[in-house]
Amino acid sequence: MLGLLKKVVGDPSQRQLKKNQKIADQVEALSDEMKSLSDDGLRQKTEEFKKRYKNGESLDDLLPEAYAVVREAATRVLNMTPYPVQILGAIALHQGNIAEMKTGEGKTLVGTMPVYLNALAGKGVHVVTVNDYLARRDSEQMGAMFEFLGLTVGLNVPGLSKEEKKEAYQADITYGTNNEFGFDYLRDNMVLYKEQMVQRSLNFALVDEVDSILIDEARTPLIISGSVERSTKLYSQANSFVRVLKNEEDYTLDEKTKSVQLTEEGVNKAERAFNIDNLFDQRHVQLLHHINQAMKAHVVMHRDADYVVENGEIVIVDQFTGRLMKGRRYSDGLHQAIEAKEGLQIQRESMTLASITFQNYFRMYQKLAGMTGTAKTEEEEFRNIYGMDVMVIPTNKPVIRDDRPDLIFKTMDAKFKAVVNEIEELYKKGQPVLVGTVSVETSELVSTLLKKRRIPHHVLNAKNHEKEAEIIENAGHRGAVTIATNMAGRGTDIKLGEGVRELGGLHVLGTERHESRRIDNQLRGRSGRQGDPGSSQFYLSMEDELMRRFGSDNMRAMMDKLGMEEDQPIESKLVSRAVETAQKRVEGNNFDARKQILQYDDVMREQREIIYKQRMEVLESDNLREIVEKMILSVIERNVQLHTPESEVPEDWDYGAIVNFMKANLLNEDDLTEKDIWGKDPEEIVEIIYDKVIERYNKKEEEFTPEHMREFEKVIMLRTVDRKWMNHIDQMDQLRQGIHLRAYGQNDPLREYRFEGFEMFEAMVASIEEEVAMYVMKAQVQQNLQREKVAEGQAVQPKPTDGDSKAKRQPVRKKETVGRNEPCPCGSGKKYKNCCGQ
């Protein structure tokens, strides 16, 4: 249908290409003018462009001249002059599109033009590559040209200090990997001081190998995780303390809200038991939290009603169905508190402190562009999800590679025997061969078979990027045999050695069709670069996964009918077309899966953006008092509303519960009595309580000075938001894991996830307000306030995917360690080495 439509109305990307051709002609027309300039004259053009941009000229206006300047600078510094087709590619990139350019057509050089142009705006440009080696290589090679033109270049790789990272991001152009850019965004939203942030706002990103990052890796979440509860001791201690408390005397239970609160006597007992002066002090946040959870475990949660003990583990009981919910855990430390209550082993939990998928990270840039050799097959996905069109840029010289039809064998053994025979024949002839495999196992199998025949070869499975580039560079030399998984060696060209052209160039031999046509096209594209000779062919068997899944029975029956031998292949265009149809079907399924995941991720994205925006406001604000007062008012209104329902007569309202709550959270023991609020309507009750709380707030501020109070509010706000947000991420993860089961009850899982996720978010916001209000009113203000991280994040760099499509994508995790002399993340106030680090 799409093909027919294009025939009638024409391909829009081709129409755009024609428009861009006119701009490219303007760039070329300026060539002589730029050649006549001295090096200094060329460099001064950068300052001239910056001034013109500030005076109102758009980047589009500057494009022809700017590209002509880069073209001339590339000739002088890199000894490379971009071809007319490369200028076309560069124009498509500036327009926020994807330039599909065949291997060897100089994508890296093409990228320099839009990068230079967009850097003139002074808002920063990120050049994103798939690995550190390519980022380093490109920043050095292309960086020399940018520096010649007076722009600064930064390199963002793992292991840099905050200062080094900040410097890299302050540069006009920053090179780095997708993982590192994503992790820095997450870490910036966990800082305690605005000065600790390293990234600027996300302006323009140019993504190299865009299909790999935005499609293959799209579902991979970047996760910063940390062990929040480093010690399980506090759970046991809180449990022992709570066991001896008496109802009404030491704590009160609100039946409606199922919340438990310590009375004044209970607080005194806790301070004596733990030998501390003030339970509400900032240093004892963790202790108070553990006591509250232990009380909830003992008073609110009942064995065999809310949970059961099975095989030494706490299993939650679903309150609606009565079914056991294995694998689910209560959040916020309640699960560990119940484990302590029941005398079971207390599990340490690693929590997600922050996470984001590449899809959502890259969609935050003002403008996004990408380059790859293969994107047209995924055009619909790029357009729907990222709003980017794919422009197929013509090659500088026609491709003369001979793409032969697939060879199909009955069995895998017969296929591999034929593969090795072919390699041996080509090796004897001296023609270089690149053997493409779908998985590491296959590459090792082919390697073993070649060793038996004593054929020297190199195996590449993306374990060493530096060595990988060297092997790939030599893969076009006479007699070279290279086995590579599909992803290995992307971004490095295979140049033909001496005398290889006469032998037919590089031969690419695929041992299996990938479920994505794009990956097969990438493998083919390794040969026949820039008009070089070359050939490619895929060897398949009826036992390959793709063939097994899609209609190989008919073909096998046909082979049997023809009485074909095991090692006798079918070579047929018809078969190749059938395989391609199967691939299209798989690609469609994968696209649907990614789209669905994105819909779920969007729920979390909206929530994350709200929290991060508010967190930023807290960091930037000098006075949070107004926000805290609003939070206090919300807390009072909610509690009063709960205990003064319209459905009851005022005589039945629970005034006692209101007074107990206010004493426990906002006021002193003598500040409020039931008599003060008896007979008043809810609005009056709220007003009376609010006035009393603000009076206490003012006294506190006089006592500790406004300056200390402002920092104190900030410390409490950041700590509370971070801890509650972490728990919320955890709860949302748990909700998502079980949500698909709702489909059995004729409910739409996505709608349910949105609805429940929103309810959970609202509950989290209410919980943040309650905790901030309580600590501001109850905690002592310390003179030497320190903002402390709620938990130490941890990061693990992802392992290369090796092109193994069968390997399940693992989340990318980042871990960060605690210094021995730093404050312990558990919140005890001691140094790490004297506390949890013993």
Curated annotation (Swiss-Prot):
Zn(2+) binds at C824, C826, C835, C836. Its main location: membrane. Residues 517-536, 789-838 are annotated as: Disordered. It holds the Pfam family SecA_PP_bind. ATP binds at Q86, G104, E105, G106, K107, T108, D493. It catalyses: ATP + H2O + cellular proteinSide 1 = ADP + phosphate + cellular proteinSide 2. InterPro entries: Helicase_ATP-bd (IPR014001), Helicase_C-like (IPR001650), P-loop_NTPase (IPR027417), SEC_C_motif (IPR004027), SecA (IPR000185), SecA_CS (IPR020937), SecA_DEAD (IPR011115), SecA_motor_DEAD (IPR014018). Transmembrane segments: none annotated. This is Protein translocase subunit SecA. It comes from Halalkalibacterium halodurans (strain ATCC BAA-125 / DSM 18197 / FERM 7344 / JCM 9153 / C-125) (Bacillus halodurans).
